Amino acid sequence: MDTIVFGTPQKPTASITPFRSLVRITSPAVEPVSLAFAKQHCRVDTDADDLYIQSLISVARQYVEDVLDITICSTVWEVKYDLFPVWAIVLPRLPMLDRAVTVTYRSGDGTYSQLSNATDFQVDASVLPGRIYPQWARSWPATRGDENSVTVRYSAGYGDDGQSAPPIVKHLILLLVAHWFDTRQPAVTGAPQSVPQTFDTLLAAASMGVYR
């Protein structure tokens, strides 16, 4: 998506703020692709492999999320930094949801404090990727500056069931499930197998480009 500045399209320049660690606090309540839909895609009519296919859906969803740096179904993430940036903290695992955000930091004396969304920082979940930044005429507080001095907890995803996720993303999951269901070894003797080119093409189309 281009940004219009004085009538001239400008390529977006935002990039994810480098972080120390990223942890998934909550797991999705449901998968964005149903078992029935996956079985239909794989052309499976029996129930014997239901548990296996369900596990493939979960693994495929995680793989697509990791590669594209996105969150499909609503998830709470916790990301840690060694210190605050100069201005905005651009958060990973887009799209950010307009839900509660907590920011905790360790000051120079080693004590922990929590910032207030009302007075200390603003949240912008309307852009990709989402970000937080200080309130008007304020700045981030000084931190101790050692590892994991800043912790941000926030929510991301395309809704609780992921149904509003781009269709191309859900189709990527289906392609992986079908491929893994049919090919259960890393390679087939005499005929090495890889994910079909169709998957790579869709993956490139779904990529967020400069945001990764």
Where are the model-predicted features located?
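Divalent metal-cofactor coordination and adjacent catalytic microenvironments
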Residues: M1-R212
